[in-house]
């Protein structure tokens, strides 16, 4: 696989999450598409609340945000001793960990930095602080590199034509470029993307508010549909492939993604349409054996009872799962930053991690 484009050649958008001058800066995605605003967060608690209330969302983006939250703690802590600093670090870690339960990148990023701190606990305090900040930057930069690789891998296997996607797995869901976002941007540059169908993605409308905004901003040919129009669009032969993100992929290939993904997978099988998930290795949780083990976040009833701040339903009971789990049998392949994984997923995901540990680069 050859990297043909740089991030700047693929998108005009800035990074979704950044850290500078002892503050975390994030695009406020709750305001889009009405207003584009980068907000400053100067406390760990503020970063945690931004993750919880979906000011920042998307598994890789919240992982990077959490990492920068620990960097923020490291640079603003008033602890006078190493013991006091490490106690405060543990509290900051717990605050950030307890924000959202489904996306594995959050825990991956936090645990990566925590492990580093444990390994260097005998180092001078200033060195521990420096290592925390350095690692947070590495996590963010590696995400951009991974997305760039996934974009080029995905463009090699997806058919030319019309692609349908769900929710927002674009640049806004990551540090930059996106998982799905990188794939469709590379296809757009190559000329192989004819049309990008976007599900509106109720109840928070990430497809309508975020994907439609960011992809049209970068000049892609997009068309928005209601979620319940997807089956008809497939039936009419208007979709050549479906590509979605993944907040957590487990050892057998089952994966959690935005609510409504499972429905699309079943429809894709019925209509003979290739169905791909795109995610970096950091979104793959080999500790969980099947999708039944993935914790599913439930969110506020107000997300369903209201739309754009306006009440659209009476005050009735609501069930509002934020994610669903798609069984691996519906997957054509998993596009990762180390190549494309094909069935059988249980065997080939295991092989992917073995190859990656040995320094290899190609999936199977």
UniProtKB/Swiss-Prot annotation:
User: Which EC class heads this enzyme's classification?
Assistant: isomerase
Reaction equation(s) it catalyzes: 5-(methylsulfanyl)-alpha-D-ribose 1-phosphate = 5-(methylsulfanyl)-D-ribulose 1-phosphate
Instruction: Keyword check for Zinc, yes or no.
Output: no
Q: Which UniProt keywords apply?
A: Amino-acid biosynthesis, Isomerase, Methionine biosynthesis
The keyword Cell inner membrane belongs to this UniProt entry's keyword annotation = no
The site annotation (Transition state stabilizer) covers 167
Q: Which InterPro entries does the UniProt entry name for this protein?
A: IF-2B-related, IF-M1Pi, IF_2B-like_C, Initiation_fac_2B_a/b/d, M1Pi_N, NagB/RpiA_transferase-like
As for family, the record states:
Belongs to the eIF-2B alpha/beta/delta subunits family. MtnA subfamily.
Tell me what this protein is called: Putative methylthioribose-1-phosphate isomerase
The taxonomy runs: Archaea, Methanobacteriati, Methanobacteriota, Thermococci, Thermococcales
